């Protein structure tokens, strides 16, 4: 039986997930309970993220702007991590869903899980095992045929 949560936070690493997966993410996470926080993180001035606007508006997802402070260094992961911790301390959620295929979210996932929060990871096949294993539930995207 799938657990249902009253306050679920959905944090999306938009720089690390394909836009065509967004609707599927919303459907899959909604099955776990009521999503009260929906945020997508990225540098929205990048050409690769220009097409996200309509989908974010359609699903009511807040776009969190994060510029890269140094060339070739992604600051988005740090912004998402800070928000995950900030929301934890505000008691804003009882389950956290992180959408990314990046292992950089392993430490924050460990931390929030140690504080009694149910952690759901959503990513692609390439997601490192460390992140998959720390999640209470990891949802794998299906490859398009």
Predicted feature residues:
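Domain-level signal for Mg2+-assisted phosphodiester chemistry and nucleotide/NA-binding surfaces
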Residues: 1-89, 110-113, 118, 126, ...
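Short, well-ordered beta-strand core segments
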Residues: 96, 137-139
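Short beta-strand segments
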Residues: 98-100
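Acidic, divalent-metal-coordinating active-site segment for phosphoryl/phosphodiester hydrolysis
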Residues: 103-110
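Class I SAM-dependent methyltransferase SAM-binding "motif I" and its flanking Rossmann-like core
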Residues: 131, 140-141
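Conserved alpha/beta core segments of nucleic-acid transaction machinery
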Residues: 144-145
């Amino acid at each position: 039986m799938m657990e249902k949560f009253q306050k679920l936070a959905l944090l999306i690493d938009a720089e690390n997930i394909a836009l065509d997966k967004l609707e599927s993410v919303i459907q899959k996470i909604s099955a776990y309970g009521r999503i009260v926080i929906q945020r997508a993180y990225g540098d929205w001035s990048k050409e690769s993220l220009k097409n996200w606007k309509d989908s974010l508006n359609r699903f009511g997802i807040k776009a969190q702007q994060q510029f890269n402070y140094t060339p070739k260094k992604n600051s988005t992961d740090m912004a998402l991590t800070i928000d995950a911790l900030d929301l934890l301390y505000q008691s804003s959620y009882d389950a956290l869903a992180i959408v990314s295929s990046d292992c950089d979210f392993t430490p924050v996932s460990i931390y929030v899980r140690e504080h009694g929060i149910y952690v759901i990871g959503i990513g692609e096949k390439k997601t490192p095992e460390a992140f998959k294993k720390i999640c209470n539930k990891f949802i794998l995207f299906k490859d398009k045929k």
